[in-house]
Amino acid sequence: MLGKHTSPHTVPGHRAPWLSPGIFCLGLPFLLGWVGLLQGHPQCLDYGPPFRPPQHLDFCSDYDSFGCCDQRKDRRIAARYWDIMSYFDLKAHELCGGYIKDILCQECSPYAAHLYDAENPQTPLRNLPGLCSDYCSAFHRSCHSAISLLTNDRGLQESHGKDGARFCHLLNLPDEDYCFPNVLRNDQLNRNLGVVAEDQQGCLQLCLVEVANGLRNPVSMVHAGDGTHRFFVAEQVGVVWVYLPDGSRLEQPFLDLKSMVLTTPWIGDERGFLGLAFHPKFRHNRKFYIYYSCLGKRKVEKIRISEMKVSLSDGNRADPKSERVILEIDEPASNHNGGQLLFGLDGYLYIFTGDGGQAGDPFGKFGNAQNKSSLLGKVLRIDVNGADVDGQRYRVPLDNPFVSEPGAHPAVYAYGVRNMWRCAVDRGDPVTHRGRGRIFCGDVGQNKFEEVDLIVKGGNYGWRAKEGFECYDKRLCRNASLDDILPIYAYGHGVGKSVTGGYVYRGCESPNLNGLYIFGDFMSGRLMALQEDRKTQKWTKRDICLGNSTCAFPGLISAYSRFIISFAEDEAGELYFLATSYPSAYAPHGSIYKFVDPSRRAPPGKCKYKPVPVKTKSKKVRFRPLAATVLDLLKEESQKAARKASNATFTSSSDRVASQKGSLKKPASSRSSKKTFRRPGTKKKSRVWSPRPQGKRKPNLDSHGVGMRQAAGRSHP
């Protein structure tokens, strides 16, 4: 979608909101993230992260504040303890009760998976936790008769009666830091339990789950707010798909507007199907709203906002004949098309338009963005629940800020916008409701800065007078009447060149993330978060990186496709992002990823919900993940290491045999001594060439990417 192309389909200065110069020539998938050696990290026996128990633990009280047991499991462990202790007299109670309680309660330890050697679900689970040698020896001396009551493992039962050393050897862990009770005493392991893990540079370590793939530039993912917990994914070409709570996709699309949507396969084309929003009362009126590029009369390019309805005969299909055009705006250029639609808490529809394109907003004396009579470069607010008296298909809210200003368009809610790419409404803190209703936007910059804004009524966001915190047009910037709203955060193009706005996390599954505004950059592929200081109301940026060993849970991945197109929130409040490895509107390389905090989860059962049933007439397409999980990669690395060690042993043995035979013969020449051993049946490796999606070879680039920049040109002066 993106960049400056000298083609009949694009214009100079044409840049997609999510792409910057010098990237789209990378045809091969570019994945971020890496996997290191598996190291200890908090993990429970169900292979999930630990949590804070919602109720007090009466028995395993050492793990009352954080661990792997809720009250139900705590009571089950207590019942087993008393069942075992019923076999002992009073003296044995005093002697062994503490040991047995300690051992049973290790299921509640935040490091339970390591104590039971259960990090990998493919390996068998221990019957007893790993005990440190001194502790194990003391337990065996005092209470070896209890072992048969604690485990039915025949090897452990046979070993304890003969030799305590043998028994303790079987319970030994390779890393003594994780055996009990050392794991309790290790300050490094317990210092930051329950908070988001950070690497040495302070980067927040999160993980991902792949939930969808094979999409053509997925630009939007929204839910209907109707209790069904479906989500609707829009592709740039104009097709919208329905995904069900079980992860499957319906075979028939919800909406197909390919014949009407204006876009091309060219990387750099920003036009297309750009926005989708469901009416707050969708469950009753079946209405939703779409934002797309189209050709009007005399081939004038327009952006169109329309209302549509869901089919009466199929709740998973739009009625193609129901489209009612709400608003059309002429586009003077093919870029900076905006594209966001959302409903505020006030029930009004907010529309986010770009400044009309080209570079520097060159239209008129002040540009479109500063011209309140233009609908370009604006945040618009309209009432779609009825028509106006003058024949317009919407009403203007009476409290819009410029309703009474001569020359200003009454639909304008805020102005001075360059090209806001992805905005979101904050649900508010789930307990205090703090922040509820705030609207966050990422506004793509020109030459130097990308910014994140909080939208306020009547606000002027500075463009083209300012870019980020700095002046862009010095003459306009010196205007005392500018009175612009500064970004809550801006970053330079050394970090990234095309911001993708995100969401404030308000979900249930990852409570540590509550209140973090998570966003990214299309060009650099960076994931970032903003954290608010409630006292100063200032925001601090935190980098997000994907964990390596911290993501060693079933189903979690630590890599993603580089080009971050959009962010999303499901009906339960969990966060996702949409990305592609090849940003063309017709290339099926887009995926959707869900954020997961591996450091802490919600207590079991807290986040359960029961979706409202929805009838499906279309066949379901089962999701098949393409990304390798961290556990898969670790297993592969382990197998490679084992093969390498085996080959080294085999080669060493062969060399010894050859040496013994050669001692009776003439010494080999220096040339023959350089030959390497190749196993029977193996062939000499040939160079592998991976084709680009277009079937072309990847261009040779110097260390500074000059070849790439020359191919791409610059998307703005």
UniProtKB/Swiss-Prot annotation:
InterPro entries given in the database record: 6-blade_b-propeller_TolB-like, Folate_rcpt-like, Glc/Sorbosone_DH, Quinoprot_gluc/sorb_DH_b-prop
Disulfide bonds: C203-C545, C207-C551, C423-C441, C508-C607
Primary site of residence: secreted
Signal peptide segment: 1-40
Glycosylation sites: N647
Pfam families: Folate_rec, GSDH
Region (Disordered): 642-717
Assigned keywords, A-Z: Disulfide bond, Glycoprotein, Secreted, Signal
GO annotation, cellular component aspect: extracellular region
SUPFAM superfamilies recorded: Soluble quinoprotein glucose dehydrogenase
Localization in the cell: Secreted
Residue stretches of biased makeup (Basic residues): 672-687
Domain of life: Eukaryota
PANTHER family referenced in this protein's UniProt entry, alphabetically: HEDGEHOG-INTERACTING PROTEIN, HHIP-LIKE PROTEIN 2
The family this protein is said to belong to: Belongs to the HHIP family.
Protein name: HHIP-like protein 2
Organism field: Mus musculus
Gene that encodes the chain: Hhipl2
